Amino acid sequence: MPVVKVRENEPFDVALRRFKRSCEKAGILSEVRRREHYEKPTTVRKRAKAAAQKRHAKKLARENARRVRLY
């Protein structure tokens, strides 16, 4: 859990902003959303496989775009 120590003469808004940023970096909100509802292991694997295929297609598209030069 991110801990933010409020400095002397520091406005509350600034400390809150630092806390939110540290939570975002730690990935707490995304973890909470992911664990909000139970997801079957098959669904997890299926989603991970779909994400991997999407990443691969994106990588291939980038490589093909780099090869094709429009003159």
UniProtKB/Swiss-Prot annotation:
Residues 39-71 are annotated as: Disordered. One of its GO terms (molecular function) is structural constituent of ribosome. Pfam families: Ribosomal_S21 (PF01165). The keyword Ribosomal protein applies. One of its GO terms (cellular component) is ribonucleoprotein complex. One of its GO terms (biological process) is translation. Residues 60-71 have a biased composition (Basic and acidic residues). Residues 43-59 have a biased composition (Basic residues). InterPro entries: Ribosomal_bS21, Ribosomal_bS21_CS, Ribosomal_bS21_sf. Belongs to the bacterial ribosomal protein bS21 family. This is Small ribosomal subunit protein bS21. It comes from Vibrio cholerae serotype O1 (strain ATCC 39315 / El Tor Inaba N16961). The gene is rpsU.
